[in-house]
Amino acid sequence: MASGIVEGGGSLSDVYSSAKRILLKARDGIERLERFESSSMDSPDLASSVKRDITEVRSLCSNMDTLWRSIPVKSQRDLWRRKTEQVGEEAEYLNLSLEKYMSRNQRKMLEAKERADLLGRASGEGAHILQIFDEEAQAMSSVKNSKRMLEESFSSGVAILSKYAEQRDRLKSAQRKALDVLNTVGLSNSVLRLIERRNRVDTWIKYAGMIATLVILYLFIRWTR
């Protein structure tokens, strides 16, 4: 009986020592992962290694649970039961810590992806806005050019009408002088009426030219808008 207890206890001791050694390694891995997290670093290989260690400890804990039940002495059996439970609890605690770390890491990766997507969309929208601004700038430039052309055309029209008015005044003065000369030399009334008719025709031509100029300016304004 004693030999059985020693053999059982020895077997449990070996398994327990292996479990404690792997737990220590897993705990150190968790601490390293948390340090990496605080420095914004990631180590997927280390996380996978810690996960494998915890799985191995769970397997050893299952073996320990079978072994302590075979110990005939109650006091020894209770002792190894508590040790087995402690190993299992520590393995579960480390597994929970690892899951929390992986959850935080996954959330950070998702947030980083969302930020990248937002920046990408913002960049695309920015380019679209710049394109709109360019089109608006081109439209404003076209309006300014049209306005300048209209002002130049209006100024040219005014200058032409002014010159035409000056010519009309000079023509009237010349006509009056010619009539005076004709009256002096005694031309017939038919000749005088012919001259007056020509004056009326010139007056109609003058007003027709003014109206045509105004119509052209109006049509140009409508075309440029």
Curated annotation (Swiss-Prot):
Transmembrane segments: 201-221
PANTHER family xref list: GOLGI SNAP RECEPTOR COMPLEX MEMBER 2, VESICLE TRANSPORT V-SNARE PROTEIN VTI1-RELATED
Protein name as it appears in the record: Membrin-11
Protein topology in the membrane: Single-pass type IV membrane protein
SUPFAM superfamilies: SNARE fusion complex
Top-level division of the source organism's lineage: Eukaryota
Keywords: Acetylation, Golgi apparatus, Membrane, Protein transport, Transmembrane, Transmembrane helix, Transport
Vesicular side: 222-225
Annotated GO CC locations: Golgi membrane
Family designation: Belongs to the GOSR2 family.
GO terms assigned for molecular function: SNAP receptor activity
A biological process term (GO) from this entry: vesicle-mediated transport
